[in-house]
Amino acid sequence: MEAPEWLDNAVDLGTSIMAVEYDGGVIMGADSRTTTGAYIANRVTNKITPIHERIYCCRSGSAADTQAISDYVRYYLEMHTSELCDEPDVKTAASLFQLLCYSNKNNLMAGIIVAGWDKHQGGSVYNISLGGSMVKQPFAIGGSGSTYIYGYCDSKFKPKMTKDECIEFVQNSLALAMFRDGSSGGVIRLCIIDKNGVERKMIPGNNLPRFWEG
């Protein structure tokens, strides 16, 4: 018997991811749908990956590629901490991702958002594109769902948001992306990072913000 066509497709994080600076830290958010072609392989994937104690990344693109890169960077940061007896900066982690993505740009499909808190810069967000460029931004969005929400994010973002304002901004942005993008869906996962540590939240699909649906 011939195998289904979707078995020949790579597992893909066709996705909606974002990270936003607020007054005191950063908030990262992602949907949870993983696709293999048109087939939904996983409805509850965790696309927010810990890299160090207060540094996380959001992954989009090939699931295998982004997981492998994350493992490499986590290892290098552990070595960094052991050798220097000091916590790494968010920029250090982002630079490692950028180096790996750029050096292997012809072989990888990986879009990464790195965010976290360190004692030098506080909360910061870095966007590493598919080609390996790195840009520091007050907020970053990525994945297939991001194409639907650029205008919304540009109009609603404001510097120095409070924690609650930032959570609402991230939830609404991702809910809009998930509604429009067929490769995004499931639940919204949030990761709130500040000087006190990391807080994880999950918003089930039936509790997502509702907008006009026609």
Curated annotation (Swiss-Prot):
InterPro entries: Ntn_hydrolases_N (IPR029055), Pept_T1A_subB (IPR000243), Proteasome_bsu_CS (IPR016050), Proteasome_sua/b (IPR001353), Proteasome_suB-type (IPR023333). The active site is at T15. Its main location: cytoplasm. It is an enzyme of class 3 (hydrolase). This is Proteasome subunit beta type-6. Keywords: Cytoplasm, Hydrolase, Nucleus, Protease, Proteasome, Threonine protease, Zymogen. Its EC number is 3.4.25.1. It is found in: Cytoplasm; Nucleus. The 26S proteasome consists of a 20S proteasome core and two 19S regulatory subunits. The 20S proteasome core is composed of 28 subunits that are arranged in four stacked rings, resulting in a barrel-shaped structure. The two end rings are each formed by seven alpha subunits, and the two central rings are each formed by seven beta subunits. The catalytic chamber with the active sites is on the inside of the barrel. Residues 1-14 form a propeptide. Transmembrane segments: none annotated.
